[in-house]
Amino acid sequence: MTTEELLEKLELIQKMKCETSTLEIKSAEQGCPQRLYDTLSSFSNQDDGGIIIFGVDEKQGYKEVGVYDPQDIQKKINEQCLQMEPTVRPLLTVVEKDGNFFVSAEIPSADITDRPVFYQGKGRMKGSYTRVGDSDEPMTEYEVYSYEAYRKKYQDDIRVIDRVSFAALDQELLATYIEFLKKGKPRLAAIPTDEIYELMSIKRDNRITLSAVMNFCPYPQAYFPQLCIIATVVPGTELGTIGEQGERFLDNQRIEGNISDMLDGAIQFVSRNMRTKTIINSQTGKREDRSDYPITAVREAILNALVHRDYSIHTEGMPIQLIMFEDRMEIRNPGGIYGRIKIDQLGKVQPDTRNPVIASELEVLKITENRYSGIPTIRRMMREYDLQQPEFLDERGSFSIKLYKNVKEYNVAEIENVDNEDLLLFCKTPRTRKEISDYLGLNSVAYAIQTRVMPLVDKGIIKMSIPEKPKSSKQLFYCD
């Protein structure tokens, strides 16, 4: 940093009156701060590094007080940097302004293979920090582990599961996998099947691996109850919102089975809980069915979570979360972005693969292509539906994707869902909530009423038998 750039930073501080994720402010009017290691660690452990500026007092309204001694403070800063592991090499700059001296310390980002950078006096587990907004927070045990797992190339997807026997696997599915695997590979086909199990990591030293459990066991949740998907439909746009009948969830399901089963179950859950409209395409003049979300994008997002979630012992108790809000869908999986790739590079560069064996097995079973095309497909399908591009979040050991619906106006003329015609005929006879829900084939009565019936009530198409008590358990719905 040049002296001119440091002066510009000082001016920026006076405008912002705050610290940021890459800017830390210290007074140092009476001496060098004794505890810099938390900021040295957190800045080193993030991709953008950070800058510490000495000589501005936050407690005095960001007053420019200057440092006590520009020469001595540089020595003290460097002394604390030498106590980090690996050693932090700051770039120090000194500038004079209005008779006061100010010092900046630029902290470079450490290579991912050197992270976490930690304070030697506290050790790796307690001396590693991460930056959250303007705060330095101690890393969790899992956050420390995630760096170690990448550096040492841990293969959590093929760790041995002693509780599972070979007989617990679906033998028919295994036979299909071996058949697909051997196809077009004469050398592999000549190898005995038992050896292929070891070669392809179904077994390790004749013991079953996690990948085999997740892909070939009929019910992996018998061994790992939380390696599942928890799917919910929320009545509002935030968790905790209460629906018209006092319900917290319009639909709620625990989706279990092997990875293929969970994928199918999650897609079915989303399909039954999103609306499908019939529209008139203004360009072709033809009727088209248009769901809230492109189902291809939904499938890729769910599959991405199942394949790339963290399967280490640290996350065994953390399920994937699928949450459908009024305006969006969120899919959250344990395990942040793996390896060197950054959030803005997703779908543009080839990433490191956290679970290569799981991905390879699913490729052989023709469930995934394993060609890194998932995120580009999601983006393309959202664009074709004229919806907002997906939002990706990497937050302290978890990864989320958000798909938004109805953000942009369609260049089409929408008409009522053709299913409404049948519903109106059904309601020629007054019906209870349960009768309507059963007729629509929906498990959640509250969801059926809120999403399919109440919009028609609001338009005056369907009427309530007790309009003055809309929540009455004796309420009937009918149309003239």
Predicted regions located by residue number:
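Conserved N-terminal catalytic/coupling substructures associated with nucleotide/phosphate chemistry
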Residues: 1-297, 302-407, 431-432, 461-464, ...
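N-terminal positioning helix adjacent to the helix-turn-helix/winged-helix DNA-binding module
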Residues: 354, 415-419, 445-448
